[in-house]
Design a protein with these regions (language model features):
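Charged docking surfaces used in two-component/phosphorelay signaling
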Residues: 29-33
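Acidic catalytic/metal-coordinating carboxylates
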Residues: 45-48, 71-75
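Acidic, metal-coordinating helix/loop segments flanking the phosphotransfer/catalytic sites
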Residues: 42-60, 81
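Disordered, acidic interdomain junction associated with two-component signaling
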Residues: 1-19
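The feature encodes the CheY-like receiver
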Residues: 68, 96
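C-terminal output helix
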Residues: 116-125
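Conserved acidic carboxylate
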Residues: 22
Length: 129
């Protein structure tokens, strides 16, 4: 098996600060396990994601596209108004081209389908940061 060991640093050389917007506990647990070396903050809807990006500094956002209260597309658009450069990776169970296009048009930098694969996520991190 491939062994990805990444030592990415975040803002000011501190540990990478990752915001995960994911309402499903199982999906969150998987992402948290993959990224256990980093500082993770979880929110469960788009409203909370926008508030966190407004109030705190993050190096990257992992954004579920289907969440209650405010979905990932709308949250991504609002985050782009606050921070046009933060990398946002869309997470979705939908692998259709239209979903990928919608995510990119909203402002996502990349698009991953669930269930997430460790290698794909870590590969994106190495390119995006």
């Amino acid at each position: 098996p491939l062994n990805h060991s990444i030592s990415l640093k975040g803002i000011n050389g501190k540990d990478l600060q990752i915001l995960i917007a994911e309402d499903n506990d199982s999906n969150y647990s998987l992402v948290k396990h993959i990224l256990k070396e980093y500082q993770i903050t979880r929110v469960v809807n788009g409203v909370e994601a926008v508030e966190k990006v407004r109030d705190e500094e993050f190096d990257i956002v992992l954004m579920d596209m289907k969440m209650p209260i405010m979905g990932g597309l709308e949250a991504t658009r609002k985050i782009r108004e606050l921070n046009p450069i933060i990398p946002i990776i869309a997470l979705t169970a939908n692998a259709f081209d239209a979903d990928r296009v919608s995510a990119m048009e909203a402002g996502c930098n990349a698009f991953l389908t669930k269930p997430l694969k460790k290698e794909e996520l870590l590969e994106l991190f190495s390119f995006k940061l």
